[in-house]
């Protein structure tokens, strides 16, 4: 695994190697902001939503299907020998510490419904790339004809990733058009 630290019009630099390419797609989710700044020389208002979940290791099945605690926004999903509890989101950037208060909130509500739950394991925090208009950036760099963008899908990255991949592939390989509503120009002009 290598982290891209610099993108130039025909070369990517990682911590280990330099790679030359004909085209490059910046599809690094919440980590796209700094790469766009290097490439375009401009700031984009990409923020990081941080979503939390915890897991309870359980020997017996406590739920037969996923459920939602509507009033608190917590969701419980049974998995093999464990129960995942998810909920809460915050705008917190990439470098802030995990919020123990948010973890405790999820645990408290899960235990309110299922008092027999053991102590939670594996607190987790995920980064979701979010733009002010809630639309992703999909399309060409206005500065370099061989650099393309595909990021900013909020909570729907896994859901929209395949469609975005198809759009970018068609753009690069066939010159297909992508609606200007997804253009990075909306933040650079």
Locate each region found by the language model:
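Active-site substrate-recognition segment that forms the wall
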Residues: 6, 19, 23-145
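Generic recognition of long tandem-repeat/solenoid scaffolds
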Residues: 14-16, 85, 148-150
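A conserved short coil-to-beta-strand element within the FAD-binding core of flavoproteins
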Residues: 1-15
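Short, well-ordered beta-to-alpha junction loops that form the rim of enzyme active sites
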Residues: 2, 88, 153
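Short secondary-structure transition/capping segments
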Residues: 12, 131-134, 186
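C-terminal lid/capping helical subdomain adjacent to the catalytic/cofactor pocket in oxidative enzymes
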Residues: 137, 141-189
């Amino acid at each position: 695994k290598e982290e891209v630290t610099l993108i130039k019009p025909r070369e990517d630099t990682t911590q280990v190697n330099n790679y030359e390419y004909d085209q490059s797609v910046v599809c690094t989710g919440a980590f796209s902001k700094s790469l766009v700044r290097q490439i375009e020389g401009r700031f984009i208002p990409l923020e990081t939503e941080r979503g939390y979940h915890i897991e309870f290791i359980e020997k017996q099945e406590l739920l037969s299907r996923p459920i939602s605690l509507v009033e608190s926004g917590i969701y419980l999903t049974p998995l093999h020998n464990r129960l995942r509890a998810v909920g809460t989101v915050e705008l917190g950037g990439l470098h802030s510490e995990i919020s123990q208060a948010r973890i405790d909130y999820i645990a408290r509500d899960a235990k309110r419904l299922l008092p027999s739950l053991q102590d939670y394991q594996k607190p987790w925090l995920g980064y979701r790339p979010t733009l002010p208009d809630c639309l992703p950036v999909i399309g060409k760099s206005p500065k370099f004809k061989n650099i393309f963008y595909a990021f900013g899908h909020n909570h729907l990255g896994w859901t929209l990733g395949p469609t975005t991949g198809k759009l970018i592939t068609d753009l690069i390989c066939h010159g297909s058009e992508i609606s200007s509503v997804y253009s990075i120009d909306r933040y650079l002009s």
